[in-house]
């Protein structure tokens, strides 16, 4: 594992000068097929784009360096990464997952994985006693999301990893909100890290992707890789190139994202129309001490809950001018979303909640926009 700091790794990992030309920016290899010998022997290590190409391999090297893993795989989306991993489990596998989590993960557990005989078990991952009770029976996998979406719960990765391993589970951590610039779950005991690279890795709201980073290149990693190559949910080379380019500015962007989030959260925490601010950087947050221990900074995602319920939340969202009402997160622009309105017929998010992705605008402009929207 490299001794360099994550910000340095983000700039250099996967960006070695091109061997053929000396170019300091990596080329994009768009070829779908590669020349092989008469008997099918691979002459340069590649055969068909679905099974690998040089651009994706550069991104894989960057991901391994940033998360400190032995193996990494890139996918067409974060959902493809999650589905490929979970569908690699055998029938009858029991999977512990968080009560507050990404809607797409919840949909997999509710609609698709039970068809394969996989048994999902929902638990509050911030409650170690509840997790300990759920681990009384053997588990195949324990899924962590911290900070969580959209309530920004903080889970103790090291403690959960110990409980999961004692129950026989592979421990997976969704590190999308934090990125390896702020948090490195493998170093805390997790076995696999999952990312929607669409978010902070891409960083510009213009490229879809997902990734898995494995602490060890073990049998499960090889099974997932085989499934990826056969089922074809791979990341396209141009998407890999855009994501790799995003890596180079990840450290600078995350620093500004976090600074802006602190300014926004501090302002909102004293506003009379705001009932609750969910951001782990606030000392009043129930997970603040854990976040301070396992994170370098507290991230740029937060949510607020307003006095006046759904109507007040929608009114405030509609009055914003610098913030854009849109889904997703991690781009340069600040976004706001009434999550309950986009979660379908049976939303889990509170009706009074707005999720906020704090972008890279001037912090003063963001605070002023929130001030005028809240009145």
What are these regions (language model features)?
Residues 1-53, 59-62, 354:
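N-terminal "arm"/small-domain region of PLP-dependent enzymes with the aminotransferase-like
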Residues 2, 12, 72-273, 278:
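Conserved PLP-enzyme active-site core in the AAT-like
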Residues 2-7, 13, 54, 276, ...:
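Positively charged, small/polar-rich N-terminal and surface patches that mediate targeting and assembly
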Residues 33-83, 88, 104-111, 350:
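Conserved N-terminal alpha-helix of the aminotransferase class I/II PLP-enzyme fold
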Residues 119-121, 133, 253, 318, ...:
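PLP-dependent enzyme catalytic core of the Aspartate aminotransferase-like
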Residues 231-232, 319-328, 373-375:
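A common structural junction motif
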Residues 243-252, 299-307, 354-359:
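Short, well-ordered beta-strand elements within core beta-sheets of diverse protein domains
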Residues 262-321, 340-348:
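Conserved small-domain helix->loop->beta segment predominantly found in fold-type I
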